[in-house]
C-alpha cells in the first residue's frame, strides 16, 4: 500500500519552502464565466458595462495551492477522482484587477491522516498584483482519498500545522435561512473556469472515486453560498 512520509516531507513540522512564482493572466470572459458558474445574476459581476462591475471575491479560490512544492517521493500523487476539496480559507486584502496578470506563490503547511486510508494536505497561497501588493491570502485542504484505489494510504504520522478547526453549531435558531436552485448542468458550466476533474461529469470517474454519480464541485458549492451570503448581508457589495 502507498505510504505517506509526512515527517520527511515537512521536517520539524516546518512549512515547505515557497514554490516558484506562477504568473496567471485572466480576462473579462474568465471573470464573467466564473460568476455565471456560481449562479450569480447580479449585474455587478455578470455585466461588464455595469458602473460597479467587479471581480467576484471568490474568483481566485481555485488557484489555491497551485505551484506548491509537494515532494511526491514522500507524498505520492493521487488520481483526480480520489482528490476532493475539503476546506478553504480566503481573505481579500485588495480587490483583484478587472483583468490582467497576477502572481501566485504557494507552500505546504501540513500533511495529516484523515480517517482510514486517507490523507489531508494543506497549502498556503499568496496572490499579488503587478505592484507586488498582496490581493488575496488563501489556505486550502486537499482530501486525498487514496493513491491507487480508494482508501489505500497506510496509517502515518502527520506533520506541520493545520488551518482546520471544528465549527460549533450555535444553540439557537439561524439569523436567516437562504435557499437557491442549482441547475442540473451547473458542473458543466463551472468546469469551464478551469476545474476539469472528471469526477464532476463522468459517471465512470465518479464510480472510481466511490460515488454513485458525478458530484458538484465543492468550490462551485462554496461560490453559490458566498453569492447568497453577499446578497443577504452585504447587499451584493463586494468592495472593501
Task: Locate predicted features.
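Active-site palm subdomain of RNA-directed nucleic acid polymerases
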Residues: 234
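HotDog/MaoC-like acyl-thioester-processing domains
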Residues: 1-19, 83-178
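Hydrophobic, proline/glycine-rich low-complexity stretches
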Residues: 1-103, 229, 237-239
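Residues in flexible loops and secondary-structure boundaries
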Residues: 32, 67, 98-100, 116, ...
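A contiguous, surface-exposed recognition patch within enzymatic or periplasmic domains that forms
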Residues: 2-49, 158-221, 228-231
Amino acid at each position: 500500500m502507498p505510504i505517506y512520509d509526512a515527517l520527511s516531507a515537512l521536517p520539524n513540522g516546518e512549512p515547505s519552502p515557497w514554490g516558484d512564482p506562477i504568473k496567471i493572466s485572466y480576462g473579462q470572459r474568465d471573470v464573467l464565466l466564473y460568476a455565471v458558474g456560481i449562479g450569480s445574476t447580479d449585474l455587478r459581476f455578470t455585466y461588464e458595462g455595469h458602473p460597479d462591475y467587479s471581480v467576484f471575491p471568490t474568483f481566485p479560490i481555485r488557484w489555491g495551492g497551485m505551484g506548491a512544492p509537494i515532494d511526491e517521493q514522500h507524498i505520492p500523487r493521487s488520481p483526480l477522482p480520489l482528490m476532493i476539496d475539503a476546506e478553504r480559507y480566503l481573505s481579500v486584502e485588495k480587490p483583484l484587477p478587472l483583468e490582467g496578470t497576477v502572481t501566485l506563490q504557494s507552500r505546504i503547511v501540513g500533511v495529516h491522516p484523515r480517517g482510514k486510508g486517507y490523507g489531508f494536505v494543506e497549502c498556503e497561497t499568496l496572490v499579488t498584483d503587478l505592484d507586488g501588493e498582496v490581493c488575496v491570502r488563501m489556505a486550502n485542504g486537499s482530501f486525498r482519498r487514496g493513491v491507487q484505489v480508494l482508501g489505500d494510504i497506510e496509517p502515518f504520522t502527520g506533520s506541520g500545522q493545520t488551518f482546520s478547526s471544528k465549527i460549533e453549531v450555535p444553540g439557537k435558531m439561524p439569523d436567516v435561512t437562504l435557499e437557491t436552485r442549482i441547475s442540473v448542468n451547473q458542473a458543466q458550466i463551472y468546469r469551464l473556469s478551469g476545474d476539469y476533474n472528471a469526477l464532476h461529469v463522468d459517471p465512470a470517474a465518479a464510480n472510481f472515486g466511490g460515488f454513485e454519480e458525478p458530484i458538484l464541485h465543492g468550490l462551485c458549492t462554496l461560490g453559490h453560498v458566498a453569492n447568497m451570503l453577499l446578497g443577504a448581508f452585504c447587499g451584493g457589495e463586494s468592495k472593501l
